[in-house]
From Swiss-Prot:
This is Serine rich endogenous peptide 7. Induction: Accumulates upon infection by generalist herbivores such as Spodoptera littoralis. Induced by wounding. Residues 1-26 form the signal peptide. Residues 46-106 are annotated as: Disordered. The lineage of its organism: Eukaryota, Viridiplantae, Streptophyta, Embryophyta, Tracheophyta.
Amino acid sequence: MGKKCSSKFRQMLVLVLLLIVFTCLSVTAPLSVTAKPTSFKVKARGIEDEGQERTHSLNSKKSSRSVEKTHHSEGRRLSNVFPNAGIRAGPSKSGQGGGRIPVAAS
């Protein structure tokens, strides 16, 4: 009977220690990279008031964020451009022959 009590006591002690360690780690753990903070404020070109931020972004032609996206997508598009893509003529899928450009008879 004495061994049963000591083994249960050890199990309970281990569980309590694990619980304490887990709670300490979860409280002190930093936010992950993908997690958003609970409260954050977006500044649009240095304006700090929220009401002014909205009107400023609605009145401006492009917000700084949309300009960043445009530049980013342009760079991506330029890296995928094939200069001779329109000149290549492969086999026809319709069965009418090769992809040649017909020349008008004179």
